[in-house]
Each structure stands twice: as C-alpha cells, then as structure tokens.
C-alpha cells in the first residue's frame, strides 16, 4: 500500500510530531510504501513576508496545491492519504486536492483547534489558553480564519480520535459521527522490567514548558516539597522560569526520545499537570511502558486514559494543594503505587503496543479504501 503522510511540524518538537514519525516507521516496517510530505514552521516562516503570506492564505493555500502537484508528478498518486496537522502552512486545501484526485482521506484529530471556540473562548466555565502566541484574541482570529473552509472536512473519509472523550467532543462539529473512529497512540515495546518505586529517586516533568501544560502549578508546588524535580523540554516560559533559584529543580532542555525514556524509566513518578485539554499524551504512554507511576491532572481525555489509583493517580487540575496531597500519598504508599504501576505496564502491552496499533491502523486504511471505491 502506498501512503502519503501529510504533516505541518511545530516549532517545538512535540507529541504530534512524534506520532507522525512513529506511525511512519510502523508502516514502513510492515512493508508499506510511505511518503512523508512535511512542511515546517521554523524553516518556512523566517521572514516577515513569509509570515504575512501565510496569514493571508491560512484558510486555503494555493502554494500547498502547487507542492502537492509536484509531489504527485514525482511519486504518483497514493492509495490513501493520512493527514495530521495542516496548520498553518498546508491548510484544508490538501483535502480539496485529494478529493479531486479521488483518493480516500484519513485525518487524525490530534488537538482541539477545530473546536477551540466551543471548548474555551466561548465557554466561561472553562479555563482557556490561546493556542496561538498564548493570546485568546489572536487564537480566536486564527480559529475563525482557519475554519473558514471547514466545509472541506466533509471530504474526509474517516477521522481518527484517540479516546471516547475526544470522539464525543468532536461529534458536536463533525455531524457524521460514523466517520469518527477511536484509535489510541502507541509506542514500541521494550524489554524493561518494572523496578520498585522505592528504588527510584527523582520526579520528572517532560512536556512543553508553557502555561497550559501546568508548569507554573508544578513549580509552585515543588517549592514546598523535599523532592528533586527534573524538567525536560523547551517552550516559551523556559527562560523566565530558569532565572529563578530552585534548589530542587533541574532543567535539561530538549532531549532525544531515548534520553527522555531513560529519564522516565529512572524516575519515581512522572507528573503530567496539564491545565488544558490534551488528546493523548505520549509521555503518559512512555511512563506506562517504562514502569513509572503517572500523576496527572483530571482533565479532558486524561480521565479516559487513567483510572485513579488503578493505572495512575489523578489530582485536581491547577490545584497546588491537591497536587501536594497526592504526592504525599505516593510517598506514603509505595506498595499500592507498585500495584498501580504493574497495572499500567500490563495495560500498555495489551492496548498500546505497536503490534496492536498496526492492526487497528491498517484496518482503518483498508476499510476506507474499500468503502470509498464502493
């Protein structure tokens, strides 16, 4: 099977970029012809003119159409196209292009940009973080412009969501709910064995260092805790936070996936304190795989992944007091924590391995191709 993978990389390498790379490797390892068509914000948006041009064409990009025509001339048409992130360079114009070529389209809904107004800006009961430049006003404007041609979403054959929570949220916008399929993210299994939590020392945070990821709540909490915290990653708040003097916090910057996995493996527990809806955090999966306890905020799809005190620990999002309380519980109950880790480890091997995910992904592709032709 020939598969085109379409993705717009982010400025900071994150979970979506990782999923694209892992799915590509997975398909290639099963002898499929995979061609990645990647555009990159950091490379293509350097000048003022390029940024202005992108803003003008954010609803529909003729430049993207030209690029796709060149790629099809070079490689030929695919059997199926799998689209990940289209913002801001590709745009929904890619849907128009492949529909006219009669190619079935799979689209993974990694984030909530499509329904951002519903989830945050127009909902006073929810804490909201702008996805663009941390600005609500700019995010509202970009959301309006980006979704100006959301009529093109009707060309998508199947949408992949990661949990029942995300499927329900997107069903309010994508009225053809039969197009929404649940397929979680995955990681390749390792030969690691589970180490008792008592034998581990530090705590780890591995994510984008920005407000919506809960980094400020985490740091405020750790001021009053006698534990060492390793912070992995980059982001807009890194330089500001590093200026402060934290005796028990170390910053390690961006690391390779293997380095991140090694850190997680050696850590007592991973804290995932996000304060904005996540889709399916890869670092939580890594902790499951590495036999490391997860302490996460009880928000959005995280509650679909983690069952409190069964395969992880949940705390109230943005609540320093509750976070500290749950950390104290972990330290006081190592036996219970080891049982939780074992449950998560077994769940990973059953539900989130590459073998299981490949069977799910290829069935989605095959069904889409078969039904499209019929």
Model-based region annotation:
Residues 100, 125-159, 173:
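Membrane-proximal helix-turn-helix segments that form the acceptor-binding/catalytic region
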Residues 187, 195-213, 219-223:
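Conserved donor-binding/catalytic core segment of Leloir-type glycosyltransferases
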Residues 308-309, 313-320, 329-334:
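Conserved acidic donor-binding segment of nucleotide-sugar-dependent glycosyltransferases
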Residues 293-296:
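Short hydrophobic beta-strand element within catalytic cores of glycosyltransferases
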Residues 322, 329, 336-351, 357-363:
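A short, well-ordered alpha-helix in the C-terminal region of glycosyltransferases
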Residues 284, 299-309, 313-314:
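Short acidic/histidine- and often glycine-rich active-site loop of Leloir-type glycosyltransferases
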Residues 165, 186:
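Carbohydrate-associated surface elements
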Residues 239-261:
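Nucleotide-activated donor-binding/catalytic signature segment of Leloir-type glycosyltransferases, i.e.
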